[in-house]
Amino acid sequence: MAMNLLNTASIAKEMQTKVTERMGDWFEAEFKAKANSASRRTRLIRSHGHTYTYARYQNTGQLSSNLKQVKKGDKIVIDAGTRANYTSGYHGMYFLVEKKGMQEVKTTLKKGANYANSMKL
């Protein structure tokens, strides 16, 4: 009788860590790109016969530099830092306060699911 010497538990654990690391890298890069594009986005204000432009979220450029991966047990969390990491105490999470930002989070999560399903190890 031949015994199967494959340790499936260790193989599954290794696969889980590889998938978690790749997904963490992918989400970090994706959210940094979204934060950079938000920092360049301008708003048009029409007032008193003139048109003014200004960057609505000027500190979101800081958001992309403050995003980092934090390993918590078996999981990887993308952390945006605290208010102290930003100038003027502004946290920079435009994703939570603007409709366009919330839509970008939804599409990024959908893309993440598709990326996980199409990942080749």
Curated annotation (Swiss-Prot):
Species: Lactococcus phage p2 (Lactococcus lactis bacteriophage p2)
GO cellular component, one term: virus tail
Function: Plays an essential role in tail assembly by capping the rapidly polymerizing tail once it has reached its requisite length and serving as the interaction surface for the connector and the tail tube proteins.
Claim: Lyase is one of the keywords in the record: no
Annotated localization: Virion
Name of the protein in question: Probable tail terminator protein
Major site of localization recorded for this protein: virion
Subunit comment: Homohexamer. Interacts with the tail tube protein.
Any one biological process term the GO annotation gives: viral tail assembly
Disulfide bonds: none
